[in-house]
């Protein structure tokens, strides 16, 4: 690679790092062990993976640890050229390399493995699509790295991003045991919480909402299309017809209340067999576009039908369904917040079994606790409620889990 191109790469890296805003950080930034030789950050498109990487570089920069940012979605950059850039970087004193959007580069697994093997004093991180399956990737990467997953923003992060904080995350056990005190403390600072919560459900899960403004819904739908048309084919062999089936399946499910899905009927409607239909659902779930809720027994079975299907988050649901059902929005919100920090299963009673112990039933302000009152560690997550009482917890408070 010629010197002019290398200079250009370093100029782009320096500009991207120093133009990065540090005023707001995603929660994951402080949880990653950046001292590891190889760190990966995977997550749905639009959640802020690139910004997280650049923020860390800016905060950690110094003459003793020269670093380089390299985006692999450049169409002119081959695997061999990316390796040459890394080799030049190390030979000239570089000790850190940060690769962005690795799934755009064919053979990225081999590149990362070779860099990890050939340059022992080089450490760094890479970002990639949530569709990547590290455990099945080439180069035996799973044992070489720490994998970190970045979900959409929580309600707490949205409040901080809006300048209404700072608020710290709350453990689930604290929310369940002391929700009245916690809710009062938050309300004393916010004044009102429900209008902010409604805004979050509409647009607050993706940081790009501030730039998108009134075009947020269009941009989110465009993001979904990019996941299906660009990211998915980059991460595995998938036929254009399968992508069309996935888009149709997503459209149907976005406007359907969560229920035990008739996958056979859905597949018949879309013209695919059951096995292919389940695989499409699993791909949409990996991408963060859907959430598949199953009982503990079904989770152990390959290609099993999930007990319930949800959109990935309330913003996606609102963007793809003209008038989303309010009850479905509630459940989608709760599941999206819980799955970032806990294991969630479909229970015989109630809506969600959390960490194998806590039973949650989700409902509106008129929801009665009597249905689950005899079950230990059972709680109601209630909408349109500022402060709860007893085992009735305001639904918005679960947005403080991360």
Kindly label every feature range from the protein language model.
Residues 45-46:
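Walker A (P-loop) phosphate-binding loop of P-loop NTPases
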Residues 49-50:
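Conserved lysine of the Walker
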Residues 90-108:
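Conserved P-loop NTPase "ATPase switch" module shared by AAA+ and STAND
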Residues 2-16, 129, 135-243:
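Interdomain motor-coupling "hinge/lid" segment immediately C-terminal to the ATP-binding subdomain
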Residues 1-22, 32, 42, 55, ...:
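A cross-kingdom feature that marks ATP-driven nucleic-acid transaction machinery
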């Amino acid at each position: 690679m010629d010197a002019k191109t290398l200079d250009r790469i370093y100029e782009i890296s320096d500009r991207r790092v120093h133009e990065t805003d540090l005023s707001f950080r995603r929660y994951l930034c402080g949880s990653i062990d950046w001292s590891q030789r190889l760190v990966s950050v995977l997550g749905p498109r639009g959640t802020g993976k690139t910004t997280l990487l650049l923020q860390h570089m800016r905060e950690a920069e110094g003459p003793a640890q020269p670093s380089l940012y390299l985006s692999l979605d450049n169409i002119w950059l081959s695997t061999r050229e990316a390796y040459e850039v890394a080799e030049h970087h190390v030979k000239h004193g570089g000790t850190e390399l940060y690769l962005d959007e690795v799934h755009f580069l064919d053979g990225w697994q081999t590149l990362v493995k070779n860099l990890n093997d050939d340059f022992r004093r080089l450490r760094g991180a890479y970002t990639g699509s949530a569709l990547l399956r590290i455990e099945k990737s080439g180069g035996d990467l799973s044992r070489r790295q720490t994998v970190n997953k970045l979900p959409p923003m929580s309600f707490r992060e949205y409040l901080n991003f809006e300048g209404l904080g700072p608020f710290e995350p709350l453990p689930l056990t604290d929310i369940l045991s002391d929700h009245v005190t916690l809710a009062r403390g938050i309300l004393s600072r916010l004044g009102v919480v429900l209008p902010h919560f409604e805004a979050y459900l509409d647009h607050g899960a993706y940081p790009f909402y501030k730039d998108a403004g009134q075009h947020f819904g269009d941009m989110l739908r465009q993001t979904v299309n990019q996941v299906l048309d660009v990211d998915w084919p980059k991460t595995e062999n998938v036929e254009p017809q399968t992508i069309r089936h996935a888009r149709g399946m997503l459209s149907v499910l976005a406007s359907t209340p969560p229920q035990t899905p008739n996958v056979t009927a859905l597949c018949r409607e879309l013209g695919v067999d059951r096995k292919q239909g389940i695989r499409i659902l699993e791909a949409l779930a990996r991408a963060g576009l859907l959430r598949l809720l199953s009982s503990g027994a079904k989770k152990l079975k390959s290609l099993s039908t999930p007990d319930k299907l949800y959109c990935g988050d309330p913003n996606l649901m609102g963007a793809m369904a003209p008038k989303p059902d309010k009850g479905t929005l509630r459940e989608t919100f709760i599941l999206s917040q819980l799955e970032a920090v806990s294991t969630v299963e479909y229970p015989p009673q109630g809506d969600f079994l959390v960490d194998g112990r806590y039973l949650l039933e989700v409902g509106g302000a008129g929801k009665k606790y009597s249905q689950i009152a005899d079950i230990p560690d059972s709680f109601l997550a209630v909408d349109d409620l500022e402060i709860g009482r007893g085992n009735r917890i305001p639904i918005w408070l679960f947005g403080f889990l991360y």
